[in-house]
Amino acid sequence: MSRVVALVLCLLAPPVCGAAEFSVTPIRLYFEPGTRSAAVTVTNEDKRPLRMQLRLMQWTQDADGADVYTDSDALVYFPRLMSVQPGEKRLVRIGLKTPAGAAERTFRLYLDELPDPADAASPPAHSGLNFTIRFALPVFLPAAAAAKPSGAIEALTLRDGKLRVAVRNTGNRHFRIANVAVRAGEAFAAEAPGWYLLAGASRIHTIDIPAGVCRGLRRLDVTVKAEELSLQGGLDVEPGMCAP
């Protein structure tokens, strides 16, 4: 969905909620090969003005596959501060500074709602919380060479009833894992949620297998389901691999 709905946060909050409602299109920005610029549309769907600040962060992943964000000026983007009136749309333009590299480069463009100065000047008489919205737009810059998703299950281990599935992105572009599914015939089935796996990164997904179930298993079949690829693996189970 392209819509950032502040109403959800308001329903979870006490009577006062200061967050605006707006939409961002697209929700993921892909630069096509040879493209030097792109645009994002922000629509104010609220009844009051929307003030926003924009900030670019480089998006990488560490040795464990955890997301790491650092300030970046690798792209040109404007405006960096903007006001959007109710019902209006504003374009955010993004441009490249340098040519494509050997691997895809990934960023997040943060669109932060700024508090309404009137709210700060005149606090509500009744108690409550004021929320603002942050939207993190993924931005993908393609590699110079043809990009094709490629991955591998590096390792499958079962120890003390914990199945660990190590997945590596062996390609030059990201892919998004939908889930990691494990099955043992009709005896056991489970899934672990997935996430983005950037080029060259790896992540371990863990699935717990109950001790009583684990001891009756002979083999586990694992499938890593991603948007554009599927990886399969298997592991023979021995009782000593299960939780005591």
Q: What do these predicted ranges mean?
A:
Residues 13-16:
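N-terminal signal peptide c-region/cleavage motif recognized by signal peptidases
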Residues 19-45, 81, 145-160, 194-196:
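Beta-sheet-dominated interaction scaffolds and their linkers
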Residues 42-46, 166-171:
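Asparagine-centered strand-capping/turn motif at beta-strand->loop junctions
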Residues 48-56, 65, 151, 174-180:
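Short, hydrophobic/aromatic beta-strand segments
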Residues 58-71, 117-118, 183-191:
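Short aromatic-acidic-glycine turn motif
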Residues 67-100, 187-214:
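Intrinsically disordered, low-complexity Pro/Gly/Ser/Thr-rich segments with frequent PxxP/GP/PP motifs
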